[in-house]
A protein has these predicted regions:
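Aromatic- and carboxylate-lined catalytic core of secreted/periplasmic carbohydrate-active enzymes
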Residues: 33-43, 56-60, 346-459, 467-505
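Short, solvent-exposed loop/linker segments at the N-terminal edge
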Residues: 39-44, 62-64, 523-530
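Active-site mouth of glycoside hydrolases
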Residues: 67-69, 129-324
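Extended acidic/polar, glycine-enriched regions
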Residues: 82-140
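Short, solvent-exposed loop/turn segments at the edges of extracellular beta-sandwich modules
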Residues: 115, 593-598
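Catalytic-core region of carbohydrate-active enzymes that cleave or remodel glycosidic bonds
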Residues: 294, 309-375
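Solvent-exposed loop segments of extracellular immunoglobulin-like
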Residues: 541-550
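Surface-exposed, flexible coil segments in extracellular/virion-facing regions
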Residues: 554-575
Length: 610
């Protein structure tokens, strides 16, 4: 059996280069690491193995970062294996960080450049806990945990290093009370004087040990950490300018944090930067190789990360447009879970984004500034109370409604049987009459005030058409229509997924499309001035009474992929700088859905002119 030394952190003399706030990082340098895997490991909580290398085994810090010196393969009670890489933590110390996904006996085997350590084997026992485990994609557009139970993704953005540790932990506890399940933040920041890596690629341990303290506090409270790998400033510093520079930095980040319950979110606002698609493709494919747990992968975006889907590395979408049409249309063209990043802190706008995203079938991530307003925290608690009690993992947009947006759950086991709705959630952003058409069953409806959480029960309903005036003419309202008995029955006997989620092929036949592109006219688009765009309906009927349009553009020769150009039936659009190549050929793609959710796609080709 291999004997391990007790974990100990080594003081770094480079603090003077790093610190803008000395006290914060000095405290973090002494952060207590997770328990030793050999002494006190717990299911779904991180533990560590610590190795002290000999002088001839670790010749320089650069070698510790650039060379793959240590790997450990863990094998659980059910014989599932995970490969974890070691990370340098100062001096001659290497650590392996790991989260046991099962209770019981684990075995591990070491692969190392050190002959002294290579092929050593040992065992440890992880005690059972009641936690849910790591998050992964399920039911096509939804989530579940390692314990195979539905997972409700509700994220809050964290300023990792802007708060001292006590204040940060107090903030975390408040988020737990609100109902949040994820904490979101950036790993590699290029802002300020506190840089994660020196020019030679050596990690600044004070930076990472401070970050450890925050992220481990997140793990201790059973949150999932949503990790934006790098902000724009870090990317623009040139640290990722080529694969040779990027790989050791990414390897270090994954070794340090990939053993925790995390998701990966690429780079900040990728769609603002030229060259970001190629960078993310390299990062994403490298993540697939490095990440032993195969955590969910996507990228942060100003609009949406959906244009990156075709590159084969991501498995969920991050969408951040304040306009609900983007995600509404996107849902009908994609087959991945989508997380909406709320863009405003103003209470009314905040609620609108919260509930519009929900009725688009999305999950949520909330900015730090928004939660500094108690009204928004209350709105989140109201949202969580209602949605956590619903079958949210089967929500799909529902269109047989007027005066509101809606999602519903179809409880059929057999897709060829008659529709059997279990519940319907509608959101009226503006007061007025909400009308919903549902199969004839007994529903137990009630109104919910999304600002206060006030619930107003209504009489049970058996009619097919349900029409109700909102309780006041001032604010937004949620009308929830569950069949409580049916929900209870399904909870006892149904599998995680009761029916295969719907997927449709967009209509591309112009003859069957109820609209046409009037503008931009001609075959050229100017790069100097905004260009008008306009849709003309060619068929006016009930299905076209509420069309939603999203305009994308791509210059194939640029390699940048699609970029969002405009939203709506008319207005002006500009070509983003990443696509602005005079003489380039731009493919203008219009994606749309009608009032019934039917999807349409039209492509036009233009030459870009100076």
């Amino acid at each position: 059996m291999l004997k391990h030394m007790q974990p100990k952190y080594i003081q770094m003399v480079r603090i003077c280069r790093l610190l803008g706030s000395v006290a914060l990082f000095a405290l973090a340098a002494y952060a207590t690491p997770p328990v030793s895997c050999s002494q006190g490991a717990r299911q779904y909580f991180p533990c560590e193995l610590t190795f002290e290398m000999q002088p001839d085994e670790l010749k320089s810090p650069q070698s510790a970062v650039n060379d793959d010196l240590l790997r450990v393969e863990f094998r659980g009670p059910s014989h599932t294996t995970y490969m974890m890489r070691g990370f340098w933590d100062g001096g001659r110390t290497l650590r392996i960080r790991f989260t046991p996904t099962e209770a019981g006996e684990w075995a591990y085997r070491i692969t190392s450049a050190s002959k002294r350590l290579n092929e050593q084997e040992a065992k440890f026992t992880a005690s059972e806990t009641a936690e849910a485990g790591m998050v992964n994609v399920a039911n096509l557009r939804h989530w579940r945990s390692t314990n195979k139970k539905p997972h409700l993704w509700l994220g809050a953005e964290a300023p990792w290093l802007d708060l001292d540790q006590p204040a940060f932990e107090t903030w975390l506890d408040a988020r737990k009370k609100n109902g949040f399940t994820h904490i979101r933040g950036t790993i590699l920041s290029g802002h300020g004087n506190n840089k994660p890596f020196a020019a030679d690629g050596q990690p600044d341990l004070a930076y990472f040990q401070a970050l450890d303290k925050r992220i481990l506090a997140v793990a201790d409270r059973s949150f999932t950490a949503d990790l934006i790998i790098a902000d724009q400033a870090f990317v623009e510093s040139g640290a990722f300018k080529d694969r040779e520079k990027m790989e050791p930095l990414l390897r270090y980040v994954v070794a340090r944090y990939g053993g925790l319950n995390v998701t990966w979110q690429g780079i900040e606002h990728f769609d603002d930067m030229a060259g970001s698609r190629g960078l993310l493709r390299d990062m994403g494919l490298f993540l697939k190789q490095l990440d032993g747990f195969r955590h969910p992968r996507s990228s942060d975006a100003r609009a949406s990360s959906s244009p990156l889907m075709g590159d084969g590395w991501m498995n969920y979408i991050v969408e951040a447009s304040p306009r609900p049409e983007v995600a509404a249309v996107e849902h009908q063209f994609t087959e991945m879970p989508s997380v909406h990043v709320v863009s405003t802190a103003e209470p009314a706008g905040f609620r609108h984004e919260l509930w519009n995203a929900t009725t688009n079938g999305q999950y949520l991530s909330v900015p730090y500034e928004a939660l500094r307003n108690d009204a928004n925290a209350k709105a989140v608690e109201t949202w969580y109370k209602l949605v956590s009690d619903a079958r949210h993992w089967e929500y799909e947009p529902f269109f047989d409604v007027s005066g509101a947006r809606a999602v519903a759950v179809d409880g059929r086991k057999d897709p060829n049987a008659e529709v059997d709705f279990v519940e319907c959630l509608t959101y009226a952003q503006s007061p007025g009459i909400v009308e919903v058409t549902l199969p004839r069953h007994k529903y137990n409806p009630y109104w919910v005030n999304p600002s206060t959480g006030e619930e107003i029960p209504l009489k049970d309903i058996r009619t097919e058409v349900i029409s109700r005036q909102t309780p006041d003419n001032i604010s937004d309202w949620v009308l929830y229509l569950p069949r409580e008995g049916r929900k209870e029955s399904m909870a006892r006997s149904y599998y995680f997924e009761s029916i295969t989620p719907p997927v449709q092929e967009p209509e591309v036949d112009v003859a069957k499309t109820p609209f046409d592109v009037v503008d931009p006219p001609g075959e050229q688009l100017s790069l100097q001035t905004p260009v008008p765009f306009k849709i003309k309906l060619t068929k006016n009927n009930r299905a076209t009474r509420a069309m939603q349009y999203v305009w994308w553009g791509e210059v194939i020769s640029s390699g940048e992929g699609l970029r969002l150009l405009a939203i709506g039936p008319a207005g002006f659009l500009s070509v983003p700088k990443a696509l602005a190549s005079p003489g380039g050929i731009l493919t203008l793609r219009l994606e749309a859905i009608n009032a019934n959710g039917k999807a349409y796609e039209i492509d036009r080709v233009y030459t870009l002119t100076p």
